[in-house]
Amino acid sequence: MATSNLLKNKGSLQFEDKWDFMHPIVLKLLRQESVTKQQWFDLFSDVHAVCLWDDKGSSKIHQALKEDILEFIKQAQARVLSHQDDTALLKAYIVEWRKFFTQCDILPKPFCQLEVTLLGKQSSNKKSNMEDSIVRKLMLDTWNESIFSNIKNRLQDSAMKLVHAERLGEAFDSQLVIGVRESYVNLCSNPEDKLQIYRDNFEKAYLDSTERFYRTQAPSYLQQNGVQNYMKYADAKLKEEEKRALRYLETRRECNSVEALMECCVNALVTSFKETILAECQGMIKRNETEKLHLMFSLMDKVPNGIEPMLKDLEEHIISAGLADMVAAAETITTDSEKYVEQLLTLFNRFSKLVKEAFQDDPRFLTARDKAYKAVVNDATIFKLELPLKQKGVGLKTQPESKCPELLANYCDMLLRKTPLSKKLTSEEIEAKLKEVLLVLKYVQNKDVFMRYHKAHLTRRLILDISADSEIEENMVEWLREVGMPADYVNKLARMFQDIKVSEDLNQAFKEMHKNNKLALPADSVNIKILNAGAWSRSSEKVFVSLPTELEDLIPEVEEFYKKNHSGRKLHWHHLMSNGIITFKNEVGQYDLEVTTFQLAVLFAWNQRPREKISFENLKLATELPDAELRRTLWSLVAFPKLKRQVLLYDPQVNSPKDFTEGTLFSVNQDFSLIKNAKVQKRGKINLIGRLQLTTERMREEENEGIVQLRILRTQEAIIQIMKMRKKISNAQLQTELVEILKNMFLPQKKMIKEQMEWLIEHRYIRRDEADINTFIYMA
């Protein structure tokens, strides 16, 4: 009923009836004078009533407000412009602006009804709606048109002068600059981009003045103080400008003023002097000036492509310094694998420390270190390994390689074998040193060479039972697996340990079976090792030797025992890998000699004639050993380095085993003895096996050739694997993928890749694309 009456009387209440009551309250609010609660609420209801009853009430209110606001702003303008001095003007403006801007949030509230009637918006008290209020917009637009647009350049220039003064060390009220910034940010009427006026004016002026300042200051400072002091200056100024920017520039999320300012500063302070600063890098790296390098790194990391020259300098230094140190120590490290590995680790730790302290282990610098260190590890300057390859009876040489993998394997052997080195270390220390070897191994390109030598040493340790710690031996296999060694290689090593354990059980059964039987040799004195040919991969070459009767008679007994337990398997005897202990008795004393089967066969030639002299020719007939093996074996008995009195004597004297003739005479040294601390020992034990290889010269040649042949097969397999998957591929992409597949075994040489590609084309596995000879197509 009440609503219908109001509507019936619509038009009877006019704007003019209420404005006289509203007007004084509006003026009080503009002047920041206090109003009563009743006046505040009356203003809300009067605005609502006028908008509801007077058809043109909303427009009239809007116009009246505009006039009042304009009048108020004119008064403020007069107060501001009464100051001629720019700084005084700025201060006056900030005072007036702060008061006015506060009222921009208060005055629009009672006039929310205007939003509904003029714009058709639903009434809301949300802050976001208040910011879009037409009254607020009216206030800000009027301020902008009446005051700000007329004096903004003076205000802006004054603000920039204050910032300039601050850069020179003068103090001032920072709120003056902040106030100007706030004006720019809040006076934009563009709803699509509310920061447009700020960006086009204040931000641009701030960036331009900053750049001008440092374009003048920076070159002067550099010239007077030098590069190293300038870097400190630039770093300090960048930090200083960032703090200043956070104070004076807009920091809301959608605004990137601070980032733009920092880019401007970097251009003026760093990019402009990039070449001059980087010229110092190489010298700093050489002098290990980590603090200065860290400073340079932090500066150059802000510059596009600023880091690349530093990475190049680091790589060049690691390679040149690393190789220089290796060459300087060449005399020692080429003959001592322990010293060699220690030298490599010293270099790695030195360069790693440099990267950590100077570049905070930044991944880019770690990659540069790895690349350069790999070059040092795989360099063939100091010592090289040449792997021969025979094709159709012709001996060919492959490209020389670093001997590093061989020396790493030798060092592992020193740690894993019973040696003076391993005896003075605890298990934990041995483990730590092996882990260090694995670290270096990661950088070795041709890991297949390491595998070959490591396996040869392991074979020797397992056969001679000279491992320092069996648990560490088996752990080493798993560590090799963890560092990415090929699974087939690691599995073979694991199988070798399995064979040794199985052999222990077989020995126990053999001894149990024959404990009451009379054999040529007591069962307790025999240790048989049954080894899987696939895992141990011995050469096909068999070396014949005439064994002593006791051993010859034992062999059938072992074969019969084995066949009872494992039918269908065939045993091949490898005397080359066998060894034993014999007792040497003379008037001086009694000594146990650890010998190879070949040494044993030679010494047994004197068993029935201990004082006779036997010629080289007759020893060859007695032992039936090949010439090369007999010479090598005899030399180990006449010139064993650890003995002062040798087991055998010979005449005439020669410089090497190659100089033995058919007529060279050999005899047992009846005065043989072991001497310790210059005293003759009546009893003792000596290992005469020493570093004698458990392979022949020809076997070693075959193994070296085998490495190359296996590389050829692996390369062919990898190419086919890639071609099957890709079907069609460019030569460059093929080489990249090929290296990725083979990198855990070896780095294929370009020559080898080319040869295998030609072989596969010839045998119609792949073909060249007719349209592009550098593209290959798989032929199913």
Swiss-Prot record:
Q: Does the keyword GTP-binding apply?
A: no
Query: What's the family?
Result: Belongs to the cullin family.
Write down the Pfam families for this protein, in alphabetical order: Cullin, Cullin_Nedd8
Q: Annotated pathway, please?
A: Protein modification; protein ubiquitination
- The gene name reads Cul5
The Cullin neddylation domain extends over: 711-772
Subcellular localization(s) per the UniProt record: Nucleus
The record, for InterPro entries, names: Cullin, Cullin_CS, Cullin_homology, Cullin_homology_sf, Cullin_N, Cullin_neddylation_domain, Cullin_repeat-like_dom_sf, WH-like_DNA-bd_sf
The location annotated for the cross-link Glycyl lysine isopeptide (Lys-Gly) (interchain with G-Cter in NEDD8) is 724
| Record GO terms (molecular function) | ubiquitin ligase complex scaffold activity; ubiquitin protein ligase binding
Q: What is this protein called?
A: Cullin-5
From the UniProt record, give one GO term of the biological process aspect: radial glia guided migration of Purkinje cell
Keywords, comma-separated and alphabetical? Isopeptide bond, Nucleus, Phosphoprotein, Ubl conjugation, Ubl conjugation pathway
Tell me how this protein assembles. Component of multiple cullin-5-RING E3 ubiquitin-protein ligase complexes (ECS complexes, also named CRL5 complexes) formed of CUL5, Elongin BC (ELOB and ELOC), RNF7/RBX2 and a variable SOCS box domain-containing protein as substrate-specific recognition component. CUL5-containing ECS complexes specifically contain RNF7/RBX2, and not RBX1, as catalytic subunit. Component of the ECS(ASB2) complex with the substrate recognition component ASB2. Component of the ECS(ASB6) complex with the substrate recognition component ASB6.
